[in-house]
């Protein structure tokens, strides 16, 4: 049997701890055998739109993502072909001209708020994970991230959360929990769940003759 990578989808609300879960799994396997594809990098290119129009982008809606490109890249990685991962510029609200070269690995983690929303993506996944975290914790984490990393103001983050993030979470993100094989409360802090995930991944790798 030839080698075939394992694809793991890690979904959950903004600030739920998806990245922490992905990082915890990554740390168990190391750089040699695992890579992470962040759905945040796959927002649609909006360079054809005026900046004022880009400011209206709803980043929490399924239509904001270029899932066609993400799916194309996963298929390439499944064939052990390298990809050029896009980079998104949040200050300009469009895709950057830069790309990141990603070499194929045995484990592919696809991480993002809506990676379980698209059936085409789900069909590529061997293991589907939903990270479930209290809404109060999620908004605090989003505040810290958007102010520190994306140059946002406190008021703008709160306004966006109430008018966009929360309703989009309830409408699109939360319902994808039903597709998950594993639901992890407390995100990356849940050591027991992470250890169980790692054991499951190793089993799937062995079944696919990767290890």
Curated annotation (Swiss-Prot):
CDD domains: UMPK (cd02023)
Gene: udk
Pathway in which the depicted protein is active: Pyrimidine metabolism; CTP biosynthesis via salvage pathway; CTP from cytidine: step 1/3; Pyrimidine metabolism; UMP biosynthesis via salvage pathway; UMP from uridine: step 1/1
Keyword Ribonucleoprotein: no
Entry-linked HAMAP family: Uridine_kinase (MF_00551)
Lineage: Bacteria, Bacillati, Bacillota, Bacilli, Bacillales
Organism: Geobacillus kaustophilus (strain HTA426)
Keywords for the protein's UniProt record, in alphabetical order: ATP-binding, Cytoplasm, Kinase, Nucleotide-binding, Transferase
Protein name: Uridine kinase
Annotated EC: 2.7.1.48
UniProt catalytic activity: uridine + ATP = UMP + ADP + H(+); cytidine + ATP = CMP + ADP + H(+)
